[in-house]
Amino acid sequence: MVIDQVKKDIEEWLINFVEVPHPALGNWAPCPYARRARKLNQYSVRLGDDVERDLFLFAKKQYMGKNDVIIYAYPAKQYDDAYFNFIVDVMNNSKGFKKRNLIALGDHPDTIEEHNGVRFNMGKYALVLLQDKVKLHNHAKLLALKGYYDGWDEEYLQDVFTHRRDPRL
């Protein structure tokens, strides 16, 4: 993988999908904060090497800095989706992630994430999106107050909120 191409592909996904309001989502964008983060250059894309090692070292030695999200990209076939999601789950439960209030959101092309017929996966790479859990919760709370989660499937939302507090409460 070439970093410039990966960055371009992810930026196109953000512009053409993640930031775009969708009728099946109540005319909300899949991530209402993505456009702002992209425009203000508050995200970083990195080529991942080893998902477990990358996340462990991030939790131990690195910081979010000005970024709202740090995205690690891996070739889609480097990991099967079960193992990839298992590692992301293990890291979310790790002492390092809890101590630093980090959350890792996995996106593997073979794990279909769909709501109301809208498929959320990036599709080309296996991604780990790292965010500050407190900041994410505060943004999600504001969205909940505005009705963002109204009409979403409860089972899907429970999966989304697995490693964080439900902002609707």
Description of each model-found segment:
Residues 1-169:
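Expand to "…catalyze enediolate/carbanion chemistry for C-C bond making/breaking, isomerization
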